[in-house]
C-alpha cells in the first residue's frame, strides 16, 4: 500500500498536517470547491514563481492563504502590485476578506514539488529525461537534510510510440514507514509528444516526538515507581535452583554445624594457659 498511495494522505495525523484547516457543517462541499479553485488559480497564474505549497485557513469572516514559494519577488511583484492583484482575485472568488502571506522556501532543492517542476520544465525544453532525472537527484542529495530521493517519469519518454515509466533512486525511501518524513511532489510536462508525468519522493529522516513514538521508545516498566530494598543482609542462595540456605536439609545441617566449629576455634587448646589483657 505504501508504494501506491499518496504519501501525504497516508501519513495524515501521524507525521503530516492538513493543507486546508477549517471547520464546516453544511458548507463543507462549498469550502472544498473553493479550496480547489484557489489552488488552481495560484497554479495557473504563477508557473514561474516556483510555488511549493499552498495552505488555507478559514474563520467565520476571513480566509488566510499562505504561499510557500522559491521566488517571492515574482509573487509580490513591483511595489506589491502582483500581490494586490492576487488578493483581489481571491476576495472576488471567496467573497470574504483574504489575508495573503508569502513565505520564502530556503532550500528549493529539497522540496519535492519544486524538484518535480524543475524536471518537467527541462522535459518541455527537449532535455533528455534520464539526464534531467539524474541532475535533479544529484542536486537534491547535496542537501544535508535529504536522506534519499526517488524520481519517476511516465509517458512517451523520448518520443516512443508506447508509453512507459522509468525511475531512479538514490539513498533510502521507506514509503511504508509511517514515521518517515516523506515529501511528495507531482507535475506534468507538456511536450510535443503529449504529457509526461513527473513524480518525486524525498526522504528526510524519521519524525520521533509524538505520543505513540515516545511510548514505544520508553523501556517497559520505566514509569513504575522503584521499590527500595529494606536494609539488612539478603539471604544467600545455594545452588542454581534459587533456594535459601535453610530451605533444604543439607543447608539446615550446615548452619547447625557452623556455631559449633566457631566455638571450637575460639576455645583455648588443652595445656595452654589463657591470656588476658591487663
UniProtKB/Swiss-Prot annotation:
InterPro entries cross-referenced by the UniProt entry:
KH_dom (IPR004087), KH_dom-like_a/b (IPR015946), KH_dom_type_2 (IPR004044), KH_sf_prok-type (IPR009019), Ribosomal_S3_C_sf (IPR036419), Ribosomal_uS3_bac-typ (IPR005704), Ribosomal_uS3_C (IPR001351), Ribosomal_uS3_CS (IPR018280)
- Region Disordered: what ranges? 215-278
Q: Can you supply a Gene Ontology BP term from the record?
A: translation
GO cellular component terms, semicolon-separated: cytosolic small ribosomal subunit
Q: Which Gene3D superfamilies match?
A: 3.30.300.20, Ribosomal protein S3, C-terminal domain
One MF annotation (Gene Ontology) recorded for this entry = mRNA binding
Bias (Low complexity) occurs at 238-278
- Give residue ranges for domain KH type-2: 38-106
Keyword line: Ribonucleoprotein, Ribosomal protein, RNA-binding, rRNA-binding
Q: What does this protein do?
A: Binds the lower part of the 30S subunit head. Binds mRNA in the 70S ribosome, positioning it for translation.
Indicate the quaternary assembly: Part of the 30S ribosomal subunit. Forms a tight complex with proteins S10 and S14.
- Which family is it part of? Belongs to the universal ribosomal protein uS3 family.
What PANTHER family would the database entry show? 30S/40S RIBOSOMAL PROTEIN S3 (PTHR11760), SMALL RIBOSOMAL SUBUNIT PROTEIN US3C (PTHR11760:SF19)
Provide the protein name.
Small ribosomal subunit protein uS3
What does the organism's lineage look like at the top?
Answer: Bacteria, Bacillati, Actinomycetota, Actinomycetes, Mycobacteriales
Amino acid at each position: 500500500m505504501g508504494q501506491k498511495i499518496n504519501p501525504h494522505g497516508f501519513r495524515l495525523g501521524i507525521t503530516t498536517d492538513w493543507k486546508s484547516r477549517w471547520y464546516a457543517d453544511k458548507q463543507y462541499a462549498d469550502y472544498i470547491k473553493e479550496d480547489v479553485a484557489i489552488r488552481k488559480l495560484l497554479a495557473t497564474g504563477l508557473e514561474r514563481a516556483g510555488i511549493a505549497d499552498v495552505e488555507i485557513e478559514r474563520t467565520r469572516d476571513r480566509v488566510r492563504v499562505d504561499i510557500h514559494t522559491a521566488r517571492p519577488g515574482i509573487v509580490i511583484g513591483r511595489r506589491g502590485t502582483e500581490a494586490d492583484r492576487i488578493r483581489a482575485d481571491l476576495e472576488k472568488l471567496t467573497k470574504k476578506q483574504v489575508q495573503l502571506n508569502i513565505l520564502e522556501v530556503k532550500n528549493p532543492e529539497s522540496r519535492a514539488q519544486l524538484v518535480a517542476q524543475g524536471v518537467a520544465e527541462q522535459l518541455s525544453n527537449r532535455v533528455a529525461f534520464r539526464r534531467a532525472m539524474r541532475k535533479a537527484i544529484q542536486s537534491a542529495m547535496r542537501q544535508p537534510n535529504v536522506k534519499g530521493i526517488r524520481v519517476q517519469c511516465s509517458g512517451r519518454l523520448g518520443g516512443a510510440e508506447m508509453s512507459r515509466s522509468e525511475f531512479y533512486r538514490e539513498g533510502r525511501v521507506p514509503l511504508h514507514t509511517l514515521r518517515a518524513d516523506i515529501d511528495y511532489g507531482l507535475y506534468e510536462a507538456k511536450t510535443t509528444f503529449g504529457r509526461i508525468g513527473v513524480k518525486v519522493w524525498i526522504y528526510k529522516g524519521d519524525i520521533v516526538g509524538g505520543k505513540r513514538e515516545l511510548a514505544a521508545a520508553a523501556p517497559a516498566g520505566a514509569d513504575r515507581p522503584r521499590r527500595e530494598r529494606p536494609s539488612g543482609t539478603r539471604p544467600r542462595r545455594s545452588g542454581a535452583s534459587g533456594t535459601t540456605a535453610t530451605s533444604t536439609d543439607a543447608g539446615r545441617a550446615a548452619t547447625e554445624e557452623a556455631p559449633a566449629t566457631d566455638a571450637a576455634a575460639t576455645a583455648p587448646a588443652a595445656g595452654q594457659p589463657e591470656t588476658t589483657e591487663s
